[in-house]
C-alpha cells in the first residue's frame, strides 16, 4: 500500500480533527467494471465492522463530475491512469487488473476465443466488433483500439460506440462486443465468450484512493486496507479483478 506522504499525512491529520467519532458510513465511487468486487467486499466489511458502505458512481465521466462538484465521497476506485490525473483523490493504492471480455448477444453462437488464433479468427469473421469509442477517453476504449490497430487484426470491422459496447449487440450494429469482462458478465442479454487471450495483455489496471471530500480519512483508509488485504483476493477474482501478485 502506498500513499504520497506529504499529502496523505496532512489529509489524515485534518480528518482526525474533523471527523465525527464513530462514523457509521462510507461512500465509495466506482465504475461498473469494478463494482461487483467492491460491492461484495463492502458487504463483508459491513458485517465485520458495522460500518455501512454505500456504492455509487457509474461511468467515468459521472465519477469525475461528482468529484469536481465536491459531493459526498470517501473512497474512489478508478482505472489507474484516470486516478493519477484526478486531483480530487489523495494517494493511490494499486488493486489489480480487470480483463477485457468478449461478448455476443444472448442466444447467438458463442465463439471460441481461448487462443490468440481463435480470437483473431472470431473477430475477422464478425460483421462488426463493437468497443467504446477511444475518443471518449476511457482506458478500455483506448486499449482495445490500440489492440485492433495491430496488423494481425487488419480486416476486422470496427464499430466504436458511445457508451457501452454491448449496446451495439442489441441494435445489430455488431455481433461481437469487447468490453470490461465484469460488465459483460453482469448483463443477461449478453453471452460471455471469455476474456481476450492473455498474450495480448488486454486488461486495465485499477487503483483506489481517498477522496479529498471525505470527512473521515482514517475510516476511508481502513476500508482501502480491507480491499487490498490478500485474504480477500478470492473475492476479487470471483468478480473479475485479478489482484496484483496473484
Residue ranges and their predicted role:
Residues 24-61, 65-71, 80-98, 104-246:
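Exported/periplasmic ABC-transporter solute-binding proteins
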Residues 8-20:
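Bacterial N-terminal signal peptides
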Amino acid at each position: 500500500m502506498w500513499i504520497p506522504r506529504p499529502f496523505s499525512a496532512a489529509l489524515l491529520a485534518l480528518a482526525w480533527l474533523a471527523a465525527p467519532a464513530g462514523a457509521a458510513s462510507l461512500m465509495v465511487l466506482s465504475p461498473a467494471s469494478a463494482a461487483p468486487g467492491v460491492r461484495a467486499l463492502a458487504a463483508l466489511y459491513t458485517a465485520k465492522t458495522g460500518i455501512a458502505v454505500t456504492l455509487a458512481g457509474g461511468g467515468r465521466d459521472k465519477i469525475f463530475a461528482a468529484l469536481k462538484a465536491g459531493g459526498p465521497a470517501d473512497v474512489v476506485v478508478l482505472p489507474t491512469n484516470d486516478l493519477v490525473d484526478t486531483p480530487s483523490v489523495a494517494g493511490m493504492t494499486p488493486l489489480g487488473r480487470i480483463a477485457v471480455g468478449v461478448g455476443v448477444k444472448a442466444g447467438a453462437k458463442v465463439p471460441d476465443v481461448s487462443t490468440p488464433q481463435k480470437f483473431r479468427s472470431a473477430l475477422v469473421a464478425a460483421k462488426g466488433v463493437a468497443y467504446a469509442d477511444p475518443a471518449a477517453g476511457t482506458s478500455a476504449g483506448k486499449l482495445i483500439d490500440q489492440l485492433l490497430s495491430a496488423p494481425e487484426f487488419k480486416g476486422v470491422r470496427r464499430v466504436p460506440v458511445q457508451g457501452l459496447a454491448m449496446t451495439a449487440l442489441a441494435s445489430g450494429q455488431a455481433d461481437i462486443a469487447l468490453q470490461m469482462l465484469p460488465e459483460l458478465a453482469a448483463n443477461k442479454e449478453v453471452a460471455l465468450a471469455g476474456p481476450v487471450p492473455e498474450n495480448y495483455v488486454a486488461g486495465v489496471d485499477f487503483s483506489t484512493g481517498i477522496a479529498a471530500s471525505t470527512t473521515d480519512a482514517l475510516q476511508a483508509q481502513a476500508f482501502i486496507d480491507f480491499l487490498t488485504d490478500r485474504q480477500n483476493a478470492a473475492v476479487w477474482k470471483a468478480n473479475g479483478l485479478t489482484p496484483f501478485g496473484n
